[in-house]
C-alpha cells in the first residue's frame, strides 16, 4: 500500500467553498462530501486539523459601515457557525471531532490550547480551529499558517474554487498560465492570490509546503498522497 506523503496536515477551507455554488450559507452536500473525504484520509493514518473561513456568512474586509476590527470579529463568529456545522457532520459519520476556538466560548467549543490540540490529533481526532487567530486584521489564511507551525503540520492543503495558482485570473484571462510549482517568494513578489502575504511569509519562514487545489471529489486524498494535483508552493520543487 502506498504511504501518504503527509502524516499531519492542516486543511484550509474557505467559507465560500462551504457555501457551494451560491457561496452563501451552508451547502450540506458540500459539507457531506468533505466529511467523506476526511474519513478516507483518516483511514490512511493521516492526522487532520481544519481551519475554516467565514466568508459564506460575513467578510470583515468588505464591511464598509463599521470599523475593521469589529467587522473582523464578526467574521470570526461566522467561522464558529461553519466549524460547528462541520463538526456535526463529521461526528454523524463516527469521526471524533473537537472544535477549538481562539476566542473563548466554553459552552460550544474548547479554548485553543496547543498541547491539547496535538494530543487530540495523536488520538485520531479531527481538530477544527475556529475564530482565526482571535485577533482582528489577521485572515484565516494566516491562522492556518500559524496553527500549522504550532502543531508541526507537514503541509497546508488549501482547498479553493480554482484548480491551482495562475499568473492571472483564469476567469478573466483565457490564456492564464497555471503553475504546477511556484516558490513562496514568487507568490509574494507577483502578488498572486494564493494566501495573503502575511500567511505566505509565515509558511516560508517555517518551511511549510502549501498545496493549492480545487475542492472537488477525491482531491483532498490526492493532495495528502502527494499526487501531482493543483499547485505546490514551497522553497524548491520536490514532486
UniProtKB/Swiss-Prot annotation:
InterPro entries: AceGlu_kinase-like_sf, Asp/Glu/Uridylate_kinase, Uridylate_kinase, Uridylate_kinase_bac
Region of interest (Involved in allosteric activation by GTP), residue spans: 20-25
Residues the record lists as binding ATP: 12-15, 55, 59, 166, 169
Activity regulation comment: Allosterically activated by GTP. Inhibited by UTP.
Keyword ATP-binding tagged: yes
GO annotation, cellular component aspect: cytoplasm
Top EC group: transferase
Catalyses which reaction(s): UMP + ATP = UDP + ADP
Protein's pathway: Pyrimidine metabolism; CTP biosynthesis via de novo pathway; UDP from UMP (UMPK route): step 1/1
Subcellular location: Cytoplasm
EC number(s) given by UniProt: 2.7.4.22
GO molecular function annotations of the record: ATP binding; UMP kinase activity
Keyword annotations from UniProtKB, A to Z: Allosteric enzyme, ATP-binding, Cytoplasm, Kinase, Nucleotide-binding, Pyrimidine biosynthesis, Transferase
Transmembrane segments: none
Primary subcellular site in the record, as a coarse category: cytoplasm
Subunit structure: Homohexamer.
Family assignment from sequence similarity: Belongs to the UMP kinase family.
Record function comment: Catalyzes the reversible phosphorylation of UMP to UDP.
Name of the protein described by the UniProt record: Uridylate kinase
Species whose genome carries this gene: Caldicellulosiruptor saccharolyticus (strain ATCC 43494 / DSM 8903 / Tp8T 6331)
Phylogenetic classification of the source organism: Bacteria, Bacillati, Bacillota, Bacillota incertae sedis, Caldicellulosiruptorales
Amino acid at each position: 500500500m502506498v504511504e501518504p506523503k503527509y502524516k499531519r496536515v492542516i486543511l484550509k477551507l474557505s467559507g465560500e467553498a462551504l457555501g457551494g455554488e451560491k457561496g452563501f450559507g451552508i451547502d450540506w452536500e458540500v459539507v457531506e462530501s468533505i466529511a467523506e473525504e476526511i474519513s478516507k484520509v483518516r483511514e490512511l493514518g493521516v492526522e487532520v486539523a481544519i481551519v475554516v473561513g467565514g466568508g459564506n456568512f460575513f467578510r470583515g474586509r468588505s464591511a464598509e459601515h463599521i470599523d475593521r476590527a469589529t467587522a473582523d470579529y464578526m467574521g470570526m463568529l461566522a467561522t464558529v457557525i461553519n466549524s460547528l456545522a462541520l463538526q456535526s457532520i463529521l461526528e454523524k459519520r463516527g469521526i471524533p471531532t473537537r472544535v477549538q476556538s481562539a476566542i473563548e466560548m466554553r459552552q460550544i467549543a474548547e479554548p485553543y490550547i496547543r498541547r491539547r490540540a496535538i494530543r487530540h490529533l495523536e488520538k485520531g481526532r479531527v481538530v477544527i480551529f475556529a475564530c482565526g487567530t482571535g485577533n482582528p486584521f489577521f485572515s484565516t489564511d494566516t491562522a492556518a499558517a500559524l496553527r500549522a507551525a504550532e502543531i508541526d503540520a507537514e503541509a497546508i492543503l488549501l482547498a479553493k474554487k480554482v484548480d491551482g495558482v495562475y499568473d492571472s485570473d483564469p476567469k478573466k484571462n483565457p490564456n492564464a498560465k497555471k503553475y504546477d510549482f511556484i516558490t513562496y517568494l514568487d507568490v509574494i513578489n507577483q502578488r498572486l492570490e494564493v494566501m495573503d502575504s502575511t500567511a505566505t511569509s509565515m509558511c516560508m519562514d517555517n518551511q511549510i509546503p502549501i498545496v493549492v487545489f480545487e475542492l472537488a471529489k477525491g482531491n483532498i486524498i490526492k493532495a495528502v498522497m502527494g499526487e501531482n494535483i493543483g499547485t505546490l508552493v514551497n522553497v524548491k520543487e520536490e514532486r
